[in-house]
Regions:
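The serine-hydrolase catalytic nucleophile loop
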Residues: 44-54, 79, 198
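Primarily recognizes the serine-hydrolase "nucleophile elbow" in alpha/beta-hydrolase
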Residues: 87-150
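N-terminal cap/lid segment of alpha/beta-hydrolase-fold proteins
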Residues: 1-28
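Mobile cap/lid helix-loop segments that gate and shape the active-site cleft of serine hydrolases
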Residues: 140-176
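C-terminal catalytic histidine-bearing segment of alpha/beta-hydrolase fold enzymes
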Residues: 201, 210-256
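Short beta-strand/loop motif that positions the catalytic acidic residue
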Residues: 180, 186-188, 192
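Conserved alpha/beta-hydrolase "acid-adjacent" motif
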Residues: 193-202
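Short amphipathic alpha-helix adjacent to the substrate-entry channel of hydrolases
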Residues: 48-66
């Protein structure tokens, strides 16, 4: 595996406009590509917190991975983070730079966790559907109205004000569903106390009503404390539970 750090998709953003490219040793024109997006309630963390997922996708699934930063809502409110991820997606699909040659960018996957799951959905559903192979939301904020009562403050920080009904429509992934939308996988632990599983359940209901392809991976983990229950405890960098990796890999291979 080879890592090319700090490829800028938007130079004016500085550090927040950077992504790291992970390339498998055996890159071919058939090597599939994934855009990955970290979580942190839209207001914290950076790309290194999702590097364990990027390493797994690259080293074990032989995929090319562009793992990105974006502007945090604590510094720049919505739509900044959404716009940044969308720009990163366009850049990964179409930028004519040497680092992005040699692998398949005709159709990419988009993947994220927690708030990054929301941003993955918002990105994948707003890019041209014929260019997106699939979207993976790992314990993501898929339905914002189901999630809002759990932590209203993160929405006030995201938007820069207390949200109104029209705000929910703008930041809701379901708003951007069409019959041509790409396949979507939502994974969620039943007792996630950071983002409730109802967020994934309600979103997948909307996907089903829309007539597009939605898949669920709901599971149980014996963990305590405030947690999504997605990471193997004490893993550095964070590594997903094996059953999660297996289910995500199945989705990626089926939709490649």
């Amino acid at each position: 595996m080879r890592i090319i750090n700090s490829i800028s998709y938007c130079p004016p953003l500085g550090f927040r406009g950077l992504g790291d490219l992970y390339l498998p040793d055996n890159v071919t024109p058939e090597t599939r590509a994934v855009l990955t997006i970290h979580g942190g309630g839209w207001s914290a963390q950076e790309k290194n917190t999702f590097s364990g997922v990027a390493i797994w996708l690259c080293s074990e699934l032989n995929m090319a991975v562009y793992n990105i930063n974006y502007r945090l809502s604590s510094i720049a409110p919505w739509p900044a983070c959404g716009d940044d991820c969308l720009e990163a997606g366009r850049f990964f699909l179409d930028a004519d730079i040497p680092e992005f040659q040699g692998f398949d960018r005709k159709r990419i996957f988009v993947m994220g966790g927690s708030a990054g799951g929301h941003l993955a959905l918002m990105t994948g559903l707003r890019l041209p559907p014929e260019r997106i192979a699939g979207i993976v939301s790992i314990s993501g904020i898929a339905d914002v109205e189901a999630d809002f009562p759990v932590d209203p403050m993160r929405y006030k920080i995201l938007l820069g004000h207390t949200p109104a009904k029209e705000d929910f429509a703008e930041i809701s992934p379901a708003t951007y569903l069409t019959p041509a939308s790409p396949a979507i996988l939502c994974t969620h632990e039943h007792h996630d106390n950071v983002v409730p599983i109802a967020s994934a359940e309600r979103f997948l209901e909307a996907v089903q009503k829309n007539g597009s392809a939605g898949e669920a991976c709901f599971y149980d983990k014996d963990e305590n404390g405030y947690s999504h229950r997605i990471w193997i405890p004490d893993s550095v960098p964070h590594k997903l539970y094996q059953e999660l990796e297996n289910r995500i890999a199945k989705f990626l291979f089926e939709h490649a």
